[in-house]
Amino acid sequence: VVGLPLGRVIGLLIGWRMTFAIIAVVATIIFVYLLLTLPQLPSRGSFTVRKMPLLLKNRVLLGIFIMSVLFATSHYTGYGYIEPFLGQVAGMSNEAVTATLILFGASGMLGSWLFSRYYPRNRYRFIGLMASGIAMLLLLLRLSALSVVTVVVLCVLWGLISTAFNVAFQDCTIRYAPADATAVAMSIYSGIFNLGIGTGAFIGGLVCTYSSIANIGYAGGMVAVLTLVYCCCRFFRNMRKADKASTTTC
């Protein structure tokens, strides 16, 4: 919620190198604190490395990982360069950019609330709406920059949807992973998501270098469309099979 805008403010005041230096110091302090305060807990699972191929044969989990890397790639293709986009393409002042980034982050709390309220009622519809929403918003990013009001509204919706989508897939990972492999599945999910972050930043950088920063939304939107197509054509089908098998077993 506050990390990106706070980092931006620090960068504007004393330089971007100090932003990363402060992040390193804070991260080190947190690491030492956790190392000294958290107790060692014995493993409660019986998962071993030999079981990894069986975990990856879980079609729903594999689909979650595929969608997660596609989602993170599409999201960070645009979000990784949203600050210069708002300044150069939308023509916003430094203060307005900072305020928009704060709203972007804060809207994620609303996304978490919507998840808790509506996701349990219909998981398929919720995931489908989030997947289609992120694709639509990214494709409309450049058009929304014609007005400060529309680009701010789009950023708020974008922050809301991206948080809700991410939380939903964390739930799916826990729901469909074997009981003794939940921690491993979540670790893979985290690694896959970070791979998507790096891939998205790389694609966004290529767009900025060889095309225009104004087109980052189109690039991210095309990846998001792939996410939506995979979701509707393959992922939901595997989810329904797993849910049906679980119900039959019970």
Tell where the protein language model's regions lie, with residue ranges.
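Juxtamembrane intracellular "pre-TM" segments in multi-pass secondary transporters
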Residues: 37-65
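Extracytoplasmic gate region of multi-pass secondary transporters
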Residues: 60-101, 106
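Structural signature of the two symmetry-related core transmembrane helices
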Residues: 24, 125-140, 221
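Helix-loop-helix hairpin linking two adjacent transmembrane segments in secondary transporters
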Residues: 1-36
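Helix-to-loop junctions at the C-terminal end of transmembrane segments
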Residues: 110-123, 208
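Intracellular juxtamembrane helix-capping segments at the cytosolic ends
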Residues: 164-178
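A membrane-interface helix-boundary motif in multi-pass transporters
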Residues: 12-24, 206-225
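A late C-terminal transmembrane helix in Major Facilitator Superfamily
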Residues: 176-213, 220
